[in-house]
Amino acid sequence: MNLKPYEHHVHYYETDKMGVVHHSNFIRWMEEARVYLMSEIGFSYKRLEDEGIISPVIGVECDYKVMVNFDDTVLIDVSEEFYNGIKMTIKYTMTDKSTGKLFAVGKSRHCFLNKEGRPVNLK
């Protein structure tokens, strides 16, 4: 599936005293992009939760390449790297909308559980 990248315009409050985006915001943007991805492929978080399924984060990583500044627009390409019905790994590639410069790459790992915390196979 070829999805349009998720787009995030950097807000002033996301920057730190050094004038660059604080590193923790990249993880938030990854979550925004993941929610977008899940909706686009027909598995919105709302739908999963309505069906009694939760999807906790079991791991996250982000490699920062270039600083991001206020007023930049970040494109986040999201793709499924691994999925076996119980666990899933999502890959994120964050680039500058105007220049294509690579800002960061990241991954998040998730599992699917019922509300009692037992694994659920979505396949």
Where on the chain are the PLM-derived regions?
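HotDog/MaoC-like acyl-thioester-processing domains
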Residues: 2-6, 39, 67-70, 81-123
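Hydrophobic beta-strand-centered segment that forms part of the acyl-chain substrate-binding groove
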Residues: 37-83, 87-88, 105
